[in-house]
Amino acid sequence: ENIFLLIEKTINNNFAGSGIAKFVAGKSWNGATKDTKLEYINLFKRHLALNIASMMRGYSDQNYELVNSRYDKKNKVTLIDMEIFSETGSIQVTWRVKKSKERYFVIDLIVADISLVVTKRSEFNSMLKNTNYNLQDFNIKLLEQNNSSYQKLIN
């Protein structure tokens, strides 16, 4: 539980959670109230932390190498490539990082050429469809999912 809370704090401090949440919500964002949006952002940030913590469970004692970094002028984003090595092979991870208010924030994580943000948008769009793109109704489902994921993670 303490490890998860540390992961959650790190993600909340270093990921552009609000911006990612808004992008992932898609068209349901515009029809929601301010309170619903704030609740959704908090639920999304917890979902993201749970998702990353769950992925990290399978990793320990891996070695990694920073392979490359480059600045994409068009999108004003820095891309940092790293390779993570394990007994079964290696995996390529690209961090998309953007500067905002004199700080750098992770805006996406691309693992084996698959964007976390694009994947989440697709996943959430399917779930939002089931609530007719009503963000308030979706928040209830997301809270239930977060609670279930949290219990699985700490048990």
Please provide the spans of the model-predicted regions.
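Surface-exposed aromatic
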Residues: 37, 80, 106
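A mature extracytoplasmic/lumenal domain signature
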Residues: 44, 70, 83-86, 97-99, ...
